[in-house]
Amino acid sequence: MTISSLFDDLRQKTSSILAKREPDISLAEHTYDCLIAIREYLQKNERLWRKEWNKEITLIPFEEAIKLLITSIYFHDIGKATREFQSTLTDKAKSSHPFYAASVLPLDLGKVKNIPLGLLAILNHHTSYYVKTEGSLYEKLDVTSPSFIEGYKEFFDFYPKLVQKIFGLNVLPISPTENSIEDIKRTLLQIKTKKTDNLKINSRNQIERIFYFISGGLVFADHVASEKEFNREGFTPYFKDTGIGGHLANSIKNFKEWRNFQIKSSQTDYSVFIEIPTGDGKTEASLLWTENNLKNKYTKVIYTLPTRVSSNKMYERLKKGVGTNETALIHSDAKFILEEEFPENGDEQKLALEYYLRKFFFLPLTIGTIDSFLVRFLHSGRWDVSRFNLQNSLIIVDEIHSYNPRLLGFLLKVLEKLTNSGNKFALMSASMPDIIKEKFQEHLTFQTIGGILQEKALFEKSPGFIGKRPESLIEALNEVIFEWEKGKNVLVVCNTIREAKSFYKQLKKWFGNNQSESLVLYHSEYTHLDRMLKEDEIYFRLGKMGWSKLRSEKIIVNSSLTEFKKIMHIKLHKKPFILIATQVVEVSLDIDFDVLFTERAPIDALIQRFGRVNRKKLRQRKAAFKIFEKLHTGKKGQWKYPYPKEILDLTWEIIKEGDFNIEDTQKWLNRVYSEGNTFANNWYQKEFEDGYNLYGKALDITKGIGKLSLSEEKLNEFVLRPVEKGLKKISVIPVQIFDAKELYSKGFKEHYLNSLEIYLYRTLANQLAFKKDRWIDIMMNKNYDYFYGVNWGDSEFSPI
C-alpha cells in the first residue's frame, strides 16, 4: 500500500473529525501535512543535527529522538477528536485539546531521566501548561475529562504503518489509555517538584537540548502545515535561491568589483570576525560569507543589529533581493510593519500566524534587534520553538562594538552554545577594542577578516582633522551657523536630550521663522511614528530618498494637526541643513554629513559619530571634527550622566588634535579599553561576567524545560540593557495627539504608533498628570510637537 492510499484510508475512516475550519481541514489531513513538513525538514537538516547530537547528547540516541519527535507530532492534536473540541469550531470557544490528548496517551511518553518529554511537548504546543517557573496554567485549569468521538482509535491503529511508509522507521504500537485530568495534573506536579530538581548541570543541558528538539520541532511542523493549509502562495521555510551575491551587486550603485576582504569572506567556511571601517562594505562581506555557507547545508540566516531603526533599514534592503516571502523582521514594532505589508489580510487568525512565523525564526532570513534574538536563550516566550529554528542557522552580529559589557558577556555565552550545536557566526565591527575581541577568542574559534594588518590601506584613510576645544558645545553656536552658511550639512551631536533641545532652541532664535527649513532635531523622545518621519526627513534632505517615498501622515505642529508633506517642501531636497541629535545617530542612520560638532564622549561613541561625516573618507571632502570638553553633568560632586566619568576623561586625554586616520582611532580605542584601564575597573569586569553567567542562572531556574516566568523584581536580574536606578520607562501619548487624531476611537496599532517612551525620573513624576486609556497612558499637562518633542518646561531633565 502506498503512502497516499494508506493516508486516504485513514482520512475516509475519520472524515467527520475536523482539525480546523475556514478552510475545513480534517484531523487526518492536518496530521499528514505535519508529518510531511517534518520529513522535509529532516531531509535538509538531519545531517548537522546528528553530527552535533552524537558529540553532545548521551541521554538518548538521535534515532530514538527522531522517533519521539515524529510520535509527538503524530498525536499532538488527537485531543481534537473530542466532542468538546469539535463544538468549539462553531461557537469559537477556547479549547483545551492538548490536555484532552494527554488523557489517552501514556503519561510517560518520551521519558528521559524520568521526565516525559513527549507528553510535555504535546501539552505545550499551544500554551505553557507546564513550563512556567512560578505558577502553572495547569494548576488553575478548570477542565473535565473529554468525550472522544468514535473513530479516534483509528489514529492509533494507523500510527506504526504511516510512520513506516513516510519515514521508513519502525515504531512500537501505542494503545489509547484512560487518564483522568487529576492523573495528568499529578504527573505534571511531580515533574515540577521532584523530577527536575536533582538533575546535574550536564543532564540539565542535555534535557534542554532534547526538549527543544521535540517541542520546537512539533510546533515547527504544526505551523508550517497550517501556513500551507491557509494557501499562502509562495510560503517556504527554506531559501528558494541562495545567490545573495548577485542581488547585492545589483543593489550597489556604481558597482565595479568586490574588494579583497569581501572576496575572502565569500570563500570562508569558518566563523568570522569582520573588522572593517564604517562605509567600506562590512555588510556586503557578511552576506557573501552567508552565501558561501548556505551551500554547506545551513538553512537559515539571522541578521542582528542594535536598534529597530537600523533593523528596519536592513530589512527593506534585503527583502528586495531575497523576497518578502522569505524575509522576516523581529523587534517590538515589527507587528505594525507586518500589518502594512499585508493590508489585504483582514483575517486576524491569518495575520497572527504570519507574525508568529516571523517572531520565532521560521522564515529563511530574519533581520532584527539583538535583544529579540538573545531573549530566547533566557527561556522567554516560545524559546523552544526559537531554539529549534535557530539550529543550522548562520548568525550575523552587526555593530557588536555598540553593546554594554553585560550584553556582550551574555552574547559570548550564547555564541558558545550555538557553536557547540554546529552553528556558525559572523561578528562585525568598525571599532571593537582588542581586549573585548580577545575575551571572545578565549571561548570561540573564528577567523579574522580585515583589521589593520590585512587591510592597511582602508585604515590609512583619513576623513579629516580633529579640533579639541575646552569650552562647551553651546558656545560654538556661531561656528555651526557659519559652516551651514558655507553650504555644508552640519551634524551636531549632544550626549543628552536636554542639551540637544537647548542647542536647538538657541539656533531657532537665530533662524526665526525659517527654522523648519534649516534645522532638524532628532532624539529618542518622539512618538514611534514621528521618529520614522524624522528618519525619512533626514534621508530626503540628504538626497537619499525621493519625494514620492515620503509618508503621507499627519503631525502636530503648534498644537494643530498638519500634513507631514506640507512642512517638507520639495525645495528642501539636498538643501544644506543642520541636524541636532543625540546618540541615536550613532548606529541608527546611514547618513553622511560634511562637518561634526560634538560633546566629548567615550572613544567608541566618538568613532561612530566620526563615521557619520565624510563616510567614504574622500580627500576632497576632508572634514572638521570638533569636540568640546565642557559638559553639564549635574550638581558639583554628583555624576548624573549617560557615560562613566573615567571613560570620558581617559578618552579626552588620549585623542589627539590634527589630521587623523582610521588606524589612529583604533589605537586610541585600544588604549582606553585596555586590560590596565577598563578591565581593571571592577564594574566593567563584573558586568561582563554577570552577563556571561545569566544563561546558567536561567537554566537553574527553568530546569532546562521551563519558561522564565518570574515576578518583575526577579526578572530585573535578567535585563540585558539595565537602566539607571531611580528611572522608570513608560509609554505615553501626548494629549494633543490623542485629541487631534481622535485616538479614543482607534485600535491598538494607532495608539502604539502615536505613543512615545520616556524615562520618568522620580523628581519629575510629581509634575506629570496621566489619564488612563485602554492601552497606554495619556500625558495631560505637557506640550508636544513634531519639531521639538515633549516640552518639559524650564525644569526639563531627561536622560539621553
Question: Which sequence ranges carry the predicted segments?
Answer:
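Inter-Walker segment of RecA-like/P-loop motor cores
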Residues: 324-379
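Conserved helicase motor
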Residues: 329-340, 497-498, 520-536, 582-586
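Conserved Walker A/P-loop ATP-binding site and its immediately adjacent core
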Residues: 298-322, 329-334, 434-437, 497
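C-terminal helicase lobe and adjacent C-terminal extensions/tails of nucleic-acid helicase motors
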Residues: 110-114, 118, 437, 478-482, ...
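Post-DEXD/H (motif II) to motif III coupling segment of the RecA-like Helicase ATP-binding lobe
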Residues: 384-394, 400-455
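Accessory nucleic-acid engagement/destabilization modules that flank
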Residues: 2-241
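Interdomain hinge/linker at the junction between the two RecA-like core domains of SF2 helicases
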Residues: 434-484
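Walker A/P-loop
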Residues: 268-290
